[in-house]
UniProtKB/Swiss-Prot annotation:
Keyword Translocase applies: no
Upper lineage: Eukaryota, Metazoa, Chordata, Craniata, Vertebrata
Cell compartment(s), UniProt: Membrane; Cell projection, Dendrite
Membrane spanning stretches: 56-76, 165-185, 187-207
Topology feature Cytoplasmic, residues: 77-164, 208
Region of interest (Disordered), residue spans: 1-34
Annotated membrane topology: Multi-pass membrane protein
Keywords per UniProt: Cell projection, Membrane, Transmembrane, Transmembrane helix
Pfam families: RTE1 (PF05608)
Gene it is expressed from: Tmem222
PANTHER family reported in the protein's UniProt record: TRANSMEMBRANE PROTEIN 222 (PTHR20921:SF0)
The protein's name in its UniProt record: Transmembrane protein 222
GO cellular component terms given for this protein: dendrite; membrane
Domain of life: Eukaryota
Organism per entry: Mus musculus
Length: 208
């Protein structure tokens, strides 16, 4: 009995505490937004919210685009997708593109930015926008395309400082993608209708 009583303290030792559960952090709203744009290792577009990170965007101009479908209004987006566009004399719009939401976008590669310094893309977009807040809008030679060209020149996109409104118009025509079928129809249908009317009238007069 003495031995049993002497060994009882060893048998009655309390069991070790269970391992603690790992704490799970709840993501904040800001972290959720970051995942929306940078999830899957890349930047995600949001057409509904008009967010086109690292893109040149384009939308038709009423009447002008009806006759010349390759001519429209252009803007450039920040790394977060916010649109900046030279919308009028001494005014650069932010997140409210003139003539409506983008119909077409041209996705650029931030890895092709050769300017030095942190956030070179956003810095170039900001500096170009600040510059055009002091400029008069000229439809023929200093317009929305010129604003985008200045931003690309400041960031030395594709290691070039020769961007201009002609090259932008051509590249956007070749590499631009429509956001939807409706955007494509909105751009080209008026031109097709006008062309059909002109051809019809021409045929009628030639048959007389």
């Amino acid at each position: 009995m003495a031995e049993a009583e002497g060994s009882s303290p060893l048998l009655l030792q309390p069991p070790p505490p269970p391992p603690r559960m790992a704490e799970v952090e709840t993501p904040t709203g800001a972290e959720t937004d970051m995942k929306q744009y940078h999830g899957s290792g890349g930047v995600v577009m949001d057409v509904e919210r008009s967010r086109f990170p690292y893109c040149v965007v384009w939308t038709p101009i009423p009447v002008l685009t009806w006759f010349f479908p390759i001519i429209g209004h252009m803007g450039i987006c920040t790394s977060a997708g916010v649109i900046r566009d030279f919308a009028g004399p001494y005014f650069v719009s932010e997140d409210n593109m003139a003539f409506g939401k983008p119909a077409k976008f041209w996705k650029l590669d931030p890895g092709q930015v050769y300017a030095s310094g942190p956030n070179a893309w956003d810095t170039a977009v900001h500096d170009a926008s600040e510059e055009y807040k002091h400029r008069m809008h000229n439809l023929c030679c200093d317009n929305c395309h010129s604003h985008v060209a200045l931003a690309l020149n400041l960031m030395r996109y594709n290691n070039s400082t020769n961007w201009n409104m002609v090259t932008l118009c051509c590249f956007c025509l070749i590499y631009g993608k429509y956001v939807s079928v409706g955007a494509f129809v909105k751009t080209w249908l008026p031109f097709v209708l006008l062309l059909g009317i002109i051809l019809t009238v021409s045929l009628v007069f030639n048959l007389r």
